[in-house]
Amino acid sequence: MKSQLSLKDPKIFELIEQEKKRQKENIILIASENFVSKEVLETQGSILTNKYAEGYPGKRYYHGCGNVDDIEQIAIERAKKLFNARYANVQPHSGSQANMAVLQALLQPNDKILSLSLNDGGHLTHGHKLSFSGKYYQSYSYNVDPTTEMLDYESIRKLALEIKPKLIIAGYSAYSRKINFQKFREIANEVNAYLMADIAHIAGFVACKLHPCPLEAQADIVTSTTHKTLRGPRGGLILTNKEKIMQQINRSVFPGIQGGPLMHVIAAKAVSFKEAQSLEFKNYQQQVIKNAQAFAQTFQKKGYHVVSQGTDNHLFLINLKKTNPLFTGEKIANILEKVNIIVNKNTIPFDQEKPMFTSGIRLGTPAMTTKGFQEADFIKLADLIDQAIKNRDDNVYLQKIKKEVLDWTNDFK
């Protein structure tokens, strides 16, 4: 029996089917992507999308919100339990909007922000000039150490003492090492700054106590996405232990930057928060890290330069210029896509290439670990990637690798 969508809108139906096929037949190594459970998908596609619910549970601007009040309260309580937080806001539509809500709540225009530079692994919303965060606030960047390619806390401290920012941001989009949130708290205390931790990429590890929790280090506020390692729907989350800050955050999210929350997404967040409390989920998170470490070590053995010489989480960067000065992330990502291996180009510390080309690629293990990959699979995958790069001009050889990948993906769950 044909689906209603295929009859009513065959073009969109066909594109969804093509994307389903692409996700099935490709090895996905985008660090910010994952595969949600059937239950999360079912919840997102539910009739909850019909309900408008401006406001917060018990304080809505529309009537008929009893059921969605209960759903949002469940999501809030599960988020609080998962991260051992006193307060949670589950309404942000994205991580970027969660960050925007925090900055709007805690800062005045032209206040100073100190965060990791984008090239070194930071995020656009942490103060980049093209983002709202760089337009409305004075943004300053710290860098990783040029030798170790890791955070240099004493250097960050000196910069903070010089700049005296109102907000310090710890948490990144392309940094492969554990973050010492306690060190950041000490630095923030010295300059009387707020400390915001953006755990969008490492939320799954924090939830399972495999990485330090910034709230335990007295971070003032924590933001996150609910996808990536947390393996929920695409959306944002804000956590804090401070009542006054939570009141400011709630006003900043609504009515500050958002209207009606997406109740079908909030319900899916609740489902994913329950999933994240299971032993199975913790085992998954442990495997994500093991896989990333085996993957990175295999590239190192093959002579590739892995930024910071390894990883403590789900991702790592490869500096392609160390392999061939003519390589760019754009070029290598395109070559790998030809053989159905999907990575993203990425800037590396102190990158001299333009952002649309970059000197590196970023590789992540969450999605394929969800598919069932173990360390041996990532060791094999590193070999295929190496072969594709070395034989990049041999289309016959690339087709051979693509066939091997297609045969392999047929076994995916």
Curated annotation (Swiss-Prot):
The protein's name: Serine hydroxymethyltransferase
The reaction(s) annotated as catalysed by this protein in its Swiss-Prot or TrEMBL entry are: (6R)-5,10-methylene-5,6,7,8-tetrahydrofolate + glycine + H2O = (6S)-5,6,7,8-tetrahydrofolate + L-serine
Where, by residue number, does (6S)-5,6,7,8-tetrahydrofolate bind?
L118, G122, H123, L124
Tell me the residues on which N6-(pyridoxal phosphate)lysine occurs.
K228
* Listed cofactors: pyridoxal 5'-phosphate
Residues with site note (Plays an important role in substrate specificity): H227
Q: What is its EC number?
A: 2.1.2.1
Localisation per UniProt entry? Cytoplasm
Keyword Metal-binding tagged:
no
Q: Which family does it belong to?
A: Belongs to the SHMT family.
Indicate yes or no for the key word Cytoplasm.
yes
